[in-house]
């Protein structure tokens, strides 16, 4: 396959055209008065969204050279979404502004490498950096950052959910209930209302092995108060292995929950018969997870309940298990799909040790899937799980609302983690002085000036989307000395943004600028593009006139 190669200014202009096509589609969604983008889907109804990364991911350009530019900016949005969970549109606007100004200066004779050095130094001055020991050195943005308290959590959620107060309040309530380590999941509701459900204690998605274990026929649940808990890695099929333990438990009169890979045959039949006779209040469930993850989850349950996970590694056989090896909890509730353990009797020091261990695994893992599963395990040990059930009148609205709730949830987590700064693009404008303080000269100075201009761009775009003149608003805010003074595009007023609840998570703003500066710098220092030459499809020749039967007209 032959390739086309484009050099110098032509390569940068091709990238710029691609960047502009993508960024112009994404940036209309920015701010409280941002517009919707409708995306055609091959199956089902069109998707209506105001989420920058969703729009960016849908864009593929016909021209292969321009498409390279679009894909690189798409990377800015995706990376920002992965790290901070929000700020994708801001990152796209910044990347476009930096690259557009940079291309002009390279065309005018500036050295691209010196420009990139200036851009990198300016971004570091604003965002800060980590030194060789991994300690965080704060940047100008950190000076305006404040920790999140009380009402602010709801305000961050509201802004990220495109000014939907209901979503903001529900997310704040969920964070309050499960804490910052708790897991918040988003599901589709069967009703039109958006509701919050909180599962206290540890829950896993395995139900009872037989409906005969049910103690509350009305709710079809098995509720066992103050039970012993046997945690076993393998299948339990022979009754003789279990008998010594069951006899000891039956004497004490307390219920028993068995968590094992499976309980089948003779063992299951005997347990059911004893339950029905009233000899022993018992319930059996399958162990959660698969493979190594199952082993880890059983260990979590053991630590939470103060028991031992009977695994092959320990070398303990089921017939040799003592009462001391069993865990216990205040209550275990089992329905056909889920098991919930409330107030396990494990030692708090053991639980804290396990939590630390899982936290370090979360930091080390490179897989998003593994990280999500580890965080779920962490939440089950520490706080519990909150489920936000999103309701809407139509499926199209449901999808759009669910995406907004997920965005708002990520933004709120980021705010709790690193604090908040004044929103509406104002925090970035306040960092211009830090770039001036670098006193860079020559082409590096031009690179720093590119960042100074780009820092104003999100505010210009927010104001432009609200139907006002961006340059006037930027000038007025720049001249005002109060760092919290800014423009509330929702009400078209100049206010103290923090008091008005117009705030952004520091992490989101910082990540957006870092990623935009990184990719724009790479694109500026590009001197050649190589891509496949698109094949021209030959049109099929028209078919001849079909012959007819004799006597036909």
From Swiss-Prot:
Entry EC number(s): 5.6.1.7
Cellular compartments annotated: Cytoplasm
Chief place where the protein resides: cytoplasm
A single GO cellular-component term on record: cytoplasm
Alphabetically ordered keywords of this record: ATP-binding, Chaperone, Cytoplasm, Isomerase, Nucleotide-binding
Subunit composition and interactions: Forms a cylinder of 14 subunits composed of two heptameric rings stacked back-to-back. Interacts with the co-chaperonin GroES.
Protein name per Swiss-Prot or TrEMBL: Chaperonin GroEL
């Amino acid at each position: 396959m032959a390739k086309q190669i484009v050099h110098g200014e032509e390569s940068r202009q091709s990238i710029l055209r691609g960047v502009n096509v993508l960024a112009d589609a994404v940036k209309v969604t920015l701010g409280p008065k941002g517009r919707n983008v409708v995306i055609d889907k091959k199956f089902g109804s069109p998707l209506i969204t105001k989420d920058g990364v969703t729009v960016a991911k849908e864009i593929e350009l016909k021209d292969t050279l321009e498409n390279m530019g679009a894909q690189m900016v798409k990377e800015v949005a995706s990376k920002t979404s992965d790290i901070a969970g929000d700020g994708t549109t801001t990152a796209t606007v910044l990347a476009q502004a930096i690259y557009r100004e940079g291309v002009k200066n390279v065309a005018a004779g500036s050295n691209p490498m010196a420009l990139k050095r200036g851009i990198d130094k300016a971004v570091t001055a604003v965002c800060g950096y980590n030194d060789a020991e991994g300690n965080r050195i704060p940047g100008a943005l950190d000076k305006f950052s404040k920790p999140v308290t009380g009402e602010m959590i709801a305000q961050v959620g509201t802004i990220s959910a495109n000014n939907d107060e209901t979503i903001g309040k529900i997310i704040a309530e969920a964070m309050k209930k499960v804490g910052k380590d708790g897991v918040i999941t988003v599901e589709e509701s069967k009703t039109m209302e958006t509701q919050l459900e909180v599962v206290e204690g540890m829950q896993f998605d395995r139900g009872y092995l037989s409906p005969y274990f049910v103690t509350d026929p009305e709710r079809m649940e098995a509720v066992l108060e103050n039970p012993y808990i046997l945690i076993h890695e393998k299948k339990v099929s022979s009754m003789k292995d279990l008998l010594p333990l069951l006899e000891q438990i039956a004497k004490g009169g307390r219920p028993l929950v068995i968590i094992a890979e499976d309980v089948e045959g003779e063992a299951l039949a005997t347990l059911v018969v004893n339950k029905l006779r009233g000899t022993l209040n018992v319930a059996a469930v399958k162990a959660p997870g698969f493979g190594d993850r199952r082993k880890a989850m059983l260990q979590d349950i053991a630590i939470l309940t103060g028991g031992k996970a009977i695994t092959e590694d320990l070398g303990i056989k089921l017939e040799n298990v003592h009462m001391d090896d069993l865990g216990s909890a205040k209550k275990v509730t089992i329905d056909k799909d889920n098991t919930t353990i409330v107030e396990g009797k494990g030692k708090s020091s053991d639980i804290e040790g396990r939590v630390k261990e899982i936290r370090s695994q979360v930091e080390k893992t490179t897989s998003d899937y593994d990280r999500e599963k580890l965080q779920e395990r962490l939440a089950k040990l520490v706080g519990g799980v909150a489920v936000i059930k999103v309701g809407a009148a139509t499926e199209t609205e449901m999808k759009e609302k669910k995406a907004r709730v997920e965005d708002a949830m990520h933004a709120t987590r980021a705010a709790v983690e690193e604090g908040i700064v004044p929103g509406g693009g104002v925090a970035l404008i306040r960092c211009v002085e830090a770039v001036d303080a670098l006193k860079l000269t020559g082409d590096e100075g031009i690179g720093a000036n590119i960042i100074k201009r780009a820092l104003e761009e999100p505010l210009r775009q927010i104001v432009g989307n609200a139907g006002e003149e961006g340059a006037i608003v930027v000038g007025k805010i720049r001249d005002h000395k109060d760092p919290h003074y800014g423009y509330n595009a929702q009400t078209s007023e100049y206010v103290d943004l923090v008091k008005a609840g117009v705030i952004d998570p520091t992490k989101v703003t910082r990540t957006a600028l870092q990623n935009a500066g990184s990719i724009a710098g790479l694109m500026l220092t590009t001197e050649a593009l190589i891509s496949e030459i698109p094949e021209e499809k030959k049109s099929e020749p028209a078919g001849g006139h079909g012959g007819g039967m004799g006597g036909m007209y």
